[in-house]
Amino acid sequence: MMRKLAVLVLAVAMVAACGGGVVGVAGAGCNAGQLTVCTGAIAGGARPTAACCSSLRAQQGCFCQFAKDPRYGRYVNSPNARKAVSSCGIALPTCH
């Protein structure tokens, strides 16, 4: 699991570096690559860092888009991701 997550984080960073991590016009400003600072929290359930919480807040409006994206959905919807969001005091949106 940790190896898969490490590969995903690397892939997200590479996609983001190439501009592919930015979601279309409706999601202008959405960049999954900014969430790589949350790897420890999402991968191992560690307490999220201040940088992670800041990135989660900045991308909060994008959570549903990330959850629906096949590249990120299973990680965004994971129990550890939900725990990290909650630990940062961020409300989880209801996605439709």
Curated annotation (Swiss-Prot):
One of its GO terms (molecular function) is lipid binding. The keyword Cytoplasm does not apply. It holds the Pfam family Tryp_alpha_amyl. Keywords: Disulfide bond, Lipid-binding, Signal, Transport. Gene3D superfamilies: Plant lipid-transfer and hydrophobic proteins. Disulfide bonds join C30-C62, C38-C52, C53-C88, C64-C95. Residues 1-27 form the signal peptide. GO terms for biological process: lipid transport. Transfer lipids across membranes. May play a role in plant defense or in the biosynthesis of cuticle layers. Belongs to the plant LTP family. B11E subfamily. PANTHER family: BIFUNCTIONAL INHIBITOR/LIPID-TRANSFER PROTEIN/SEED STORAGE 2S ALBUMIN SUPERFAMILY PROTEIN, NON-SPECIFIC LIPID-TRANSFER PROTEIN 2. This is Non-specific lipid-transfer protein 2. It comes from Oryza sativa subsp. japonica.
